[in-house]
């Protein structure tokens, strides 16, 4: 059976039109109704908007941050795996899922402030993060901000800028095409979807982020940069990010795309767990220094 997906280029959600997905099979079905779990779901008033979040498990806090147009359910594969090991905290980012938008111009800076606000709301002393796509961008922004004590973070398919030096050219073109379609819907006063919200999400993809590479040196956390070797984000850009973070490791997943957390969650989760659970190492391959 063909799956309907929404391609906001850096994430997968239901969308403007059906896209046949024959090559990448993703799982978003779980026994627990993640994102709709009334038993654990709560709202917090953060920076003027009601932000919906859920918590699972006990232990050290682990934030899971989803990608553009996604929701809590998007990272159900990670919740399933990590909730037996950590206190998993996951929210619908502003304007997505059950969380309010309350702005006419959404930015990664705003989403970052929201997550920092949620950390303060929950009175968390320190955290670790797994961020996918836009969630990875937010994780990097939180690390640069330095307002939250972050032990470790794993980013999957994150980028510093929206142009073709970082993102594959076909994806840049697709964002432009989708923008035109959304603007047409707004002009037609179509009411089948909230097209103004859709435009804001596409503006995030097309115009942001704009993180100076030099700012990565401010990140004190230990970071694992992950990407698929067939990612939307260019591998050389993932390498660029890795090379400018003081305490970083790099993992290019063979035979995987931007969607590995859902298409190959077993491998992705094992990689992330190994990084989070084991002492950080960045050995020098110069054996003349070995003792």
Residue ranges of predicted features:
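Short beta-strand/loop motif that positions the catalytic acidic residue
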Residues: 219, 225-227
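Active-site nucleophile elbow and catalytic-triad environment of alpha/beta-hydrolase enzymes
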Residues: 199-215, 229
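Flexible "cap/lid" loop of the alpha/beta hydrolase fold
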Residues: 137-145, 152-182
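Alpha/beta-hydrolase fold catalytic core
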Residues: 2-7, 13-60, 85, 277-291
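Active-site loop/oxyanion-hole signature of alpha/beta-hydrolase fold enzymes
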Residues: 90-130
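Catalytic active-site module of serine/aspartate enzymes centered on a nucleophile-bearing elbow/loop
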Residues: 255-291
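Conserved loop-alpha-helix segment in the C-terminal half of the alpha/beta-hydrolase fold
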Residues: 80, 227-256, 262
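Conserved HGGG/HGGXW glycine-rich cap/lid loop of the alpha/beta-hydrolase fold
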Residues: 49-98
């Amino acid at each position: 059976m063909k799956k309907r997906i929404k391609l906001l280029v850096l994430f997968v959600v239901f969308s403007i039109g059906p896209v046949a997905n024959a090559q990448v099979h993703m799982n978003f079905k779980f026994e627990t109704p993640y994102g709709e779990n009334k038993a654990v779901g709560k709202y917090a008033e953060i920076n003027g908007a009601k932000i919906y979040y859920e918590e699972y498990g006990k232990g050290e806090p682990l934030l899971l941050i989803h990608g553009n147009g996604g929701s809590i359910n998007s990272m159900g594969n990670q919740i399933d795996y990590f909730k037996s090991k950590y206190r998993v905290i996951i929210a619908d980012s502003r304007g997505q899922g059950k969380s309010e938008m309350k702005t006419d111009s959404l930015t990664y800076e705003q989403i970052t402030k929201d997550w920092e606000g949620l950390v303060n709301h929950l009175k968390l002393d320190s955290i670790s993060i797994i961020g996918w796509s836009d969630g990875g961008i937010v994780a990097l922004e939180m690390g640069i901000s330095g307002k939250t004590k972050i032990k470790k973070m794993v980013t999957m398919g994150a980028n510093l800028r929206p142009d073709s030096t970082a993102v594959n050219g076909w994806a840049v073109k697709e964002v432009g095409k989708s923008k035109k379609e959304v603007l047409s819907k707004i002009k037609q006063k179509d009411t089948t979807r909230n097209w103004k919200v859709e435009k804001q999400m596409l503006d995030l993809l097309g115009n942001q982020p704009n993180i100076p590479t030099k700012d990565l040196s401010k990140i004190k956390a230990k970071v694992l940069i992950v990407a698929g070797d067939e990612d939307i984000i260019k591998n050389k850009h993932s390498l660029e990010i890795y090379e400018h973070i003081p305490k970083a490791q790099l993992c290019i997943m063979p035979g995987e795309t931007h969607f590995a957390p859902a298409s190959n969650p077993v491998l992705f989760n094992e990689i992330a767990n190994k990084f989070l659970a084991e002492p950080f190492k960045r050995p020098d391959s110069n054996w003349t220094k070995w003792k």
